[in-house]
Structure formats: C-alpha cells, structure tokens
Curated annotation (Swiss-Prot):
Entry's family note: Belongs to the pyruvate, phosphate/water dikinase regulatory protein family. PDRP subfamily.
Protein name, UniProt field: Putative pyruvate, phosphate dikinase regulatory protein 2
InterPro entries assigned: ATPase_NBD (IPR043129), Kinase-pyrophosphorylase (IPR005177), P-loop_NTPase (IPR027417), PPDK_reg (IPR026565)
Record bears the keyword Transferase: yes
Keyword Nucleotide-binding: yes
HAMAP family xrefs: PDRP (MF_00921)
Amino acid sequence: MTIFVISDSAGETASKLAAASMAQYPTVDFTLIRRTFVKDEDKLVQALEDAKKAEAMVLHTIINDHLVAIANQFFNEHQLFHFDILTPPVAEIERLTGVAPMREPGALHHLNENYFKRIEAMEFAVKYDDGKDPRGFLEADVLLLGVSRTSKTPLSLFLANKNLKVANLPLIPEAHLPKQLFEMDPKKIVGLTNDPNVLNGIRKERMRAYGLPENTSYSDIEKIRRELAFANDLYQKLGCIVIDVASLSIEETASMILNALNLEDHSYYSTETSED
C-alpha cells in the first residue's frame, strides 16, 4: 500500500501521522512518499497525479484555501481517498474563537523558534539571578535593580516567559557595585522601589515563615529606609526608570516595564511539543 504525504512545508506532521497509522499494521507492506513545500498549483497537481498513478492514500497538510479547493476537486473527480489534517481543526478553532488563521505555511516552525527563545530566556534569568554573574548584564534586555523583597526574581522569570533576557541585582548599601552596571544603557535598567512600611511587613512575614523572630536588622524600618534611600540615589545617578511596586502585582509591574522600555511581548505561543 502506498501513502502519499503532501505538505506546503516540511511535511513532518503528516509524516508522523502516517507513521503512527502504519505502525498498527506490521504485516502490511507500506510505501511512504513525501511531496513537500508544495506551495503552488502546478506542484500540487503534479503531486496529486503521482498519487493517483500509485493508487495511494493521501495525507496532506495544506493551509492555503485555494490549493485545498483544488485538491478536494481532484480527490472527488478521481475518487482518491484523502485525509485533510489541518482544515477541520483550523476551521473549528476559527469558529469557536472568531479569530481568522494566518494561513501561513510552516507557521509552526516560527512558533517553535519562539518557544526555544523562551527557554533560552528562562535559562538566562536563572543564570543571572540575584547578581550571580554581572558579566551577563551587558547581554540582558532588561536589568532589574532593587533592595531585598522588591520582586526582582519573580519579575525576571515572568519577563523571561515573554522571551526577554532579564538579569537582576540586589542592592545592598555595603556591597560593591559591579562595573558592568555603569557600562549598561540606562534605558535597559529598571529600578524597583517600595514603601518602607510595606517592605517592613513583607520582611517580617518572611522571618516568620523561616521560624525566626520578626524583629531583626533585616526588617528594621530605619534600615529599610536607608536601603531605599541608597537605591533611589543610585537610580538617580544612573538615570534609569523607577517603578514603585508597593501596590502592584507582578503582572502589573511587568506590563509597566514593557511599556516603559518599549519592549514587545513575544509570548504569543506556548507549547510543550515541537512538530512541523
């Protein structure tokens, strides 16, 4: 038995479906023939004629409406068995969402590229979290600065999920500031600040969560004020954007960062698999 795969892209999706189907019949002698990157009428008709001569079953992933119509007419005229893999689910998604499909051949390859960029961004955020390696600052799309408990790490990961490479640096008045901080474009730096009383409550809660006394130097209100003053002075010297996170959620802060730095949200696709 011959199975033809016809695709306007690399044909991996249809080929995998064909392989999965053939695997159910170990005693049948199959021939799998692929016609890929079929993007015009001439190539399509030639592929269909070849399938007809081989008396083949046709599995196709063609997204162009005009080419699908030509294929359907051919199938009907020549009584050739076929299975349209893309059209039914795409049409149903359009019906349910009211959103028209791109109808772009090989679109999933672009989406997969986006997916791997997100993975790369997540790895970057972990690697350069908490000022671990300031050498990464110059590679970052965004550098977050802030005293302890200003949501630097969750913000880094949230923005990384939008394909942005984000590093962050905790600000401690007694600590040395890395030279890379002053080599960065200040337009890529975001200084996070907070209300001292809010920060005091957050730090006390953190101490309680660790089973420690809540009144420590870490949660001391005067120390917090000094830390925030140090941070705000630094932000002024750097000339960077400053965001007060006191009453903001992670999502709200991230949205403000994207808008302030004129960065695009590239998280329009999410998947756990990579196919055609």
